[in-house]
Amino acid sequence: MEITELKREIQQIAARLGKTQDYLDLPALNANIQDLEQIAAQPDFWDNQETAQKTLQQLNDLKSSVEEYHQWMGQLEDLKAIAELLELEEDATLNEEAEANLTQLNHELDRWELQRLLSGIYDSKGAVLTINAGAGGTDAQDWAEMLLRMYTRWGEQQGYKVHLTEISEGDEAGIKSATLEIEGRYAYGYLKGEKGTHRLVRISPFNANGKRQTSFAGIEVMPALEEEDLKVEIPEKDLEITTTRSGGKGGQNVNKVETAVRVVHLPTGIAVRCTQERSQLQNKEKALALLKAKLLIIAQEQRAQAIAEIRGDMVEAAWGNQIRNYVFHPYQMVKDVRTNTETTDVNGVMDGKLDLFIESYLRSN
């Protein structure tokens, strides 16, 4: 990178950080931190543990924002120092270091700016993402498994913890359904736009004649809510609870004990299933928690079409309902039909590179 270009990039980052400082309002932020620290120092602070924990979480969030800003300012000063050295003497190693630091800092600022768009009541929560095979038979079940890998890879790349909480194997290949719990701040905010139908076009590996096949899978995304958030009372008469033997490959517990639990909320038809815990009781508790989260979100929306809008799998995973097309043949292209965002890097997308689509959706909304 030429020194003039480096200095121009540094000026642009300095301008971005100036806007960041204005947005944060550091004097007010520091005043809030002092107020919360005084509250936390009171002798009766832990008398109400729920309130105390929320206060500490708020305090930690504010401190993290301040520390993050100062860290970025430190990185900016380092870049300025490197630029001064490069003006005096060319150094390939220093130049590479400057480019790497610029890329990293720009990426962190992009991420921070994107998070400012996540202002929904549950956007900062973790996410529960469910995949259901739609129209397309065996190909659709294989497609559902490919999406399972894609979202798992995305979560891991973001530094989130990803847990598989339910899976139903396909008849010949792939999966009929699966549920991922993605732990981490803003996971729901980032993933909420993924709900809907995802369409795949490719040469079917399951067709002896090598014909092109179109397959569909439905994605549902819900926030992972804490116990204190789940203040939803569900009458027993509104629940239908069934148990089955855990499906899957291997394991001493598979197909021997009925540990899998399926819970249906009869008034709405919402169904959840959990298979991954070792006991029936644990699976029942997890399934009920997820059901409560879904009902709570629907109540928050207070719209007649709330279920259809919040639950991606309520729209039939079939032709005409897709939010995104993944074309492997006769050309390679992934295109979001809502934002017209597209890329030819099909392999990258299937390996979890979804930020292009996530960011364009958030900005469009």
Swiss-Prot record:
Protein biosynthesis keyword on record:
yes
Q: What keywords would UniProt list here?
A: Cytoplasm, Methylation, Protein biosynthesis
InterPro entries according to UniProt? PCRF, Pep_chain_release_fac_I, Pep_chain_release_fac_I_sf, PrfB
N5-methylglutamine found at:
252
Q: Which GO terms describe its molecular function?
A: translation release factor activity, codon specific
Task: Indicate whether 4Fe-4S appears among the record's keywords.
Answer: no
Enumerate the subcellular locations listed in this protein's record, separating them with semicolons: Cytoplasm
Q: What is the recorded post-translational modification? A: Methylated by PrmC. Methylation increases the termination efficiency of RF2.
Q: Name one GO cellular component term.
A: cytoplasm
This molecule's function is given as: Peptide chain release factor 2 directs the termination of translation in response to the peptide chain termination codons UGA and UAA.
Query: To which protein family does this belong?
Result: Belongs to the prokaryotic/mitochondrial release factor family.
Protein name (Swiss-Prot/TrEMBL): Peptide chain release factor 2
